[in-house]
Amino acid sequence: MTLYDLLELPQTATLQEIKTAYKRLAKRYHPDINKQGADTFVKINNAYAVLSDTTQKAEYDAMLRFSEFEDRVKRLDFSIKWHEQFMEELQFHHNWDFDFIRNREYTQPTPTNNKYSSFLDKDVSLAFYQLYSKGKLDFDLEDTLLRRHSIKQAFLKGKKLNDVLKEQYNYLGWLEAKRYFNIDVEIELTPKEVREGGVVNLPLKIKVISNNYPGQMWYELNKNYSFRLLWDIKNGEVAEFFGKGNRALGWRGDLIVRMRIVDKIKKRLRIFSSHFEQDKTKLWFLVPQDKQDNPNKWVFDYKTHEFIV
């Protein structure tokens, strides 16, 4: 199965046919209409993101024709494999150019207004993270980006590199895509736990993309955050911790914790998607058992933002 198959189209489909098919299928599988269609809805959105972009579509079509890929596609359902890489393994590549299929010289990604192009372009995403967090770029990254023809030409005309990047790539799209790596959780607490000021553990497995591990594109980092419960916690209170979420392409998502006071705990920890606002335990994270030992000997006071030994 290919991305065209996901949209129920032949590989000769035009951009207009792709757009029409996407609208029809998105309406059919939208979670608000079809409660069982959430996974398919995400898949067809991802397929449309590639096939609706002329540059990425050309790359994908070339890959379909590539003999090595044709041999591989006989042995696996490629749409499922591709979807797993997008949603689970996070094996992102330069501007969706699918370099993992074939070895060739690096080609400069073409600037595009695609919503997630800057997020998927590793160097640009790292640049935006540095601009977002400290307002400047590292020298080595500047040198790498200036090797791109379009950036170099604009820079030589006297424009500031920071402005060139934001003009040629979608900085606002990057900021929006960044939300996908927030971890949005809800914890259930009893009034007794709040009164006694106990400690609640939040064991999470965080997805990480890092160049420090050349043999693999991602790995899982075990984190066990601990919170000291204060007597004045209110039902619905929200605590946000910057940089404590998933990590990818140079930046970190945030951890957002909502407190829910209940008479009896039915489910200690719920993990939600900041995009779909629904239970996300199957998409990104494995939720450990509540009784798991806490390897973290430090307790974090979420109101003072200080660690307690």
Swiss-Prot record:
Pfam family, any one: DnaJ
Which keywords does this Swiss-Prot/TrEMBL entry list?
A: Chaperone
Enumerate the Gene3D superfamilies for this protein: DnaJ domain
**Which residue numbers delimit the J domain?**
1-66
CDD domains membership:
DnaJ (cd06257)
Q: Name one GO molecular function term.
A: protein-folding chaperone binding
Spell out the InterPro entries in the cross-references. DnaJ_domain, DnaJ_domain_CS, Hsp70_co-chaperone_J-domain, J_dom_sf
Q: Which domain of life is it from?
A: Bacteria
This chain's protein is named DnaJ-like protein MG002 homolog
